[in-house]
Swiss-Prot record:
This is SNF1-related protein kinase regulatory subunit beta-1. GO terms for biological process: fatty acid biosynthetic process; nitrate assimilation. The lineage of its organism: Eukaryota, Viridiplantae, Streptophyta, Embryophyta, Tracheophyta. Kinase-interacting sequence (KIS) is specific for the alpha catalytic subunit interaction and Association with SNF1 Complex (ASC) is specific for the gamma non-catalytic regulatory subunit interaction. SUPFAM superfamilies: AMPKBI-like (SSF160219), E set domains (SSF81296). It is found in: Cell membrane. Sumoylated by SIZ1. Pfam families: AMPK1_CBM, AMPKBI.
Length: 283
């Protein structure tokens, strides 16, 4: 049968070629030269003809450019490259890392249980999945406080075991506080706490009577460290303390002569100036 089909095709091709030739001959008045001019050139003549020859036919392998067209899709088929989210468990289109997973559970019976809340301005109602006697749903919500209510078999209800609030009309809805939970780990903050003071470093003994009988010091111990009575090199290298500024000091008996030295130290910005006045001791 394959050979028969091949013969039929060859015959059809031959007959088609004969029709073209005969029609061309008739249109040119039966001129043999015209018949030869309208005869299809062979592959050899096409290869030998110059590129600009009018007898050269266009190559069958050259196609016109086509504009890419989007593939057809069925009405019930999802669009290509589209990530399907579980709408019963996702309220927002945000990725999971931008929200906090939150589970709402209803365990007080009912066949058809749904929930609606302020996370989407009460626009949608999500159905809870039943597992045994409980109904639950998972939301991925941003941090914040939301109000919601449970619809059980078409009747609005709330969970009494969880925080709830009622409005002026008497409608009651639950409160959902969504926030990031950081578990407390006392061991992680021990190194930041100050070490406790030893108990033996403190006492509650009251001062004795002899402590009150002591006379106070005439001059504080800091005022004994003055520039008077020191060597010149030590006085230049030592920076005066702030407690000795603007105080007049007197030094006696530091020389064999009977001379009294009076000293006063001032500070001007970062510089210290000490003025020493020598006066003979009067008798």
């Amino acid at each position: 049968m394959g050979n028969a089909n091949g013969k039929d095709e060859d015959a059809a091709a031959g007959s088609g070629g004969a029709d073209v030739t005969s029609s061309s001959a008739r249109s040119n008045g039966g001129d043999p030269s015209a018949r030869s001019r309208h005869r299809r050139p062979s592959s050899d003549s096409m290869s030998s003809s110059p590129p600009g020859s009018p007898a050269r036919s266009p190559s069958p392998f050259l196609f016109a450019p086509q504009v890419p067209v989007a593939p057809l899709q069925r009405a019930n088929a999802p669009p290509p490259n589209n990530i399907q989210w579980n709408q019963s468990q996702r309220v927002f289109d945000n990725p999971p890392e931008q929200g906090i997973p939150t589970i709402i559970t209803w365990n007080q019976g009912g066949n058809d249980v749904a929930v609606e809340g302020s996370w989407d301005n009460w626009r949608s109602r999500k159905k809870l999945q039943k597992s045994g006697k409980d109904h639950s749903i998972l939301f991925v919500l941003p941090s914040g406080i939301y109000h919601y209510k449970v619809i059980v078999d078409g009747e609005s209800k709330y969970i009494p075991d969880l925080p709830f609030v009622a409005d002026e009309v008497g409608n009651v809805c639950n409160i959902l506080d969504v926030h990031n939970f950081v578990p407390e780990n006392p061991e992680s903050i021990v190194e930041f706490e100050a070490p406790p003071s030893p108990d033996h470093s403190y006492g509650q003994t009251l001062p004795a009577a002899e402590d009150y009988a002591k006379e106070p010091l005439a001059v504080p111990p800091q005022l004994h460290l003055t520039l008077l009575g020191t060597t010149e090199e030590t006085a230049i290298a030592t920076k005066p303390q702030h407690v000795v500024l603007n105080h007049v000091f007197i030094e006696q008996g530091w020389t064999p002569q009977s001379i009294v030295a009076l000293g006063l130290t001032h500070r001007f910005e970062s510089k210290y100036i000490t003025v020493v006045l020598y006066k003979p001791l009067t008798r």
